[in-house]
């Protein structure tokens, strides 16, 4: 399945049942990730340090457990700091794919990457989203169904995730799409580009589900150790995602923990 996607998704999307057409826009859009403001978290860290120094000076051992708990909670916030990321492409159910050309140009100019290769890598990512969406429609017998049909509404509800599942659904979607993009870059010889996807400081620090793209790290690590195993893991995630975002998300967490 993964091989079929990578061989056709740019040059022959029709073989995957995908339309070749997509929209292009010159607007610059940013998407915010994380939960906590960096300045506020830094301020909280300084306050904790002062309390620790005061505790050491006064030998107030009784307050140590509470301070330790506060420090643990503060450290968790370091993995959820807010940051913005320039949007390069977008897939929206019912609207299709949009690629943001100026954003792609800006990214390539900043890093010295080949524009055509980076453009196609974004297209890979968004087309995997579209392919995934079509698979969900098919699973709910909603492919070609009327918008007002019960099957279509059920598929739409599932695709976006039901309330608390929304963040988990986003992680699963981005993991499947971004890993395909990362592997496509490797196969095209764009090694520096693929490596950079995992090394942006803010992105490397922020964890799932607050940064859904972080889920790809486990699959990338597995590919390095066993390319055959990662193909099986990818197919497993894809199948799980059609019935349970939660189960697919838990599998991604396991892969990330093992990396």
What does each model-identified segment do?
Residues 121-137, 178:
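Active-site recognition of the HExxH zinc-binding catalytic motif
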Residues 117, 133-175:
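Post-HEXXH active-site segment of zinc metalloproteases
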Residues 95, 118-122, 175:
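Residue-level detector of short, conserved catalytic/binding motifs and their immediate flanks
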Residues 22, 56, 122-125, 170, ...:
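Residue-level recognition of hydrophobic positions within alpha-helical transmembrane segments
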Residues 170-186:
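An active-site-proximal "capping" alpha-helix that borders the catalytic cofactor pocket
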Residues 1-115, 239-247:
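A metal-dependent hydrolase signature that marks the N-terminal structural subdomain at the beginning
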Residues 185-259:
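Pan-zinc metallopeptidase signature
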Residues 82, 88-90, 128, 175, ...:
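Glycine-centered structural positions embedded in regular secondary structure
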């Amino acid at each position: 399945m993964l091989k079929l996607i990578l061989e056709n998704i740019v040059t022959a999307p029709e073989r995957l049942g995908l339309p070749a057409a997509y929209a292009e826009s010159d607007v610059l859009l940013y998407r915010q990730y994380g939960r906590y403001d960096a300045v506020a978290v830094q301020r909280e860290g300084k306050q904790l340090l002062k309390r620790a120094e005061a505790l050491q000076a006064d030998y107030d051992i009784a307050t140590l457990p509470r301070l330790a708990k506060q420090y643990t909670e503060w450290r968790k916030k370091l993995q959820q700091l807010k940051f913005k990321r320039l949007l390069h492409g977008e897939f929206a159910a019912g609207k299709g794919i949009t690629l943001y050309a100026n954003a792609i140009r800006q990214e390539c100019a900043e890093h010295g990457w080949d524009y055509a290769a980076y453009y196609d890598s974004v297209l890979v990512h968004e087309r995997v989203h579209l392919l995934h969406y079509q698979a969900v429609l098919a699973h709910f017998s909603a492919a070609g169904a009327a918008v007002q049909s019960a099957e279509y509404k059920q598929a739409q509800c599932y695709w976006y995730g039901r309330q608390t599942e929304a963040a988990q659904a986003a992680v699963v979607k981005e993991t499947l799409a971004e890993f395909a993009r990362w592997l496509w870059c490797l196969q095209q010889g764009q090694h520096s580009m693929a490596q950079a996807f995992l090394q942006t400081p803010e992105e490397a620090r922020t964890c799932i589900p607050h940064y859904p793209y972080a889920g790809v790290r486990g699959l990338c690590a597995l590919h390095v150790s066993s390319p055959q195993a990662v193909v099986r893991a990818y197919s497993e995630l894809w199948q799980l995602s059609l019935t349970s975002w939660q189960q697919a998300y838990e599998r991604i967490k396991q892969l990330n923990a093992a990396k």
